[in-house]
From Swiss-Prot:
One of its GO terms (cellular component) is plasma membrane. The lineage of its organism: Bacteria, Pseudomonadati, Pseudomonadota, Gammaproteobacteria, Enterobacterales. Part of the ABC transporter complex BtuCDF involved in vitamin B12 import. Responsible for energy coupling to the transport system. Its EC number is 7.6.2.8. This is Vitamin B12 import ATP-binding protein BtuD. It comes from Citrobacter koseri (strain ATCC BAA-895 / CDC 4225-83 / SGSC4696). ATP binds at residues 33-40.
Amino acid sequence: MISLMQLQDVAETTRLGPLSGDVKPGEILHLVGPNGAGKSTLLARMAGLTFGEGTVIFDGASLETWPAAKLAQHRAYLAQQQNPPFSMPVWHFLTLHQPDKTQTNLLNDVAQALGLSDKLGRSANQLSGGEWQRVRLAAVILQIHPHANPHGQLLLLDEPMNSLDVAQQNALDRLLSQLCSQGIAIVMSSHDLNHTLRHAHRAWLLKQGKLIASGRRDEVLTPPNLAQAYGMNFRRLDVEGHRMLISTT
């Protein structure tokens, strides 16, 4: 399969790399590793928000050559933190992110899927942390959703599961799976190894800015690889037909 994004010897001073890899259309790729591994730095680089050593090719062209407005049509990026806009209704904030403003049904569908239907009229700065996280997720999904944007290709998510309960995480997983089935590539950072083991197609395991392992989730999330990354021992178990990782240290 042709790659959507290629990274070649990408590096950030003291924080990242050099590392190389690729992202394929319609896949879910998880970035995993301990705090300080470089996941957020790598996502920002892939989003075109920072530049440094190495090359990032997106859809056949160097990421540095993409005009910001055009890039926003093709990729959406959820930063780890973002303050809510002052006194802006949620529906207005979401509409700003949706390229085709006529797709009101899509906005309502995404809001309903994430449990936001009763929050659309509220001001963004009056939401709880978990509510605001779901609003931000809805915004980036609307930005590149194929029903509102035929150019959408890539969704980058930095710790998207933060502040979400189990039911909300499950709802987000369903939405991401739907996007994936429509050809959108999804790259997200995660601290939940068992979530990665269940939902990722591929994984990159990082430690101190270095890529320790990359490939299919089963090939990457092995006890030896995880011990190298986290400095502790792991076991992989099968529990009622589901694979599970547990620490043994």
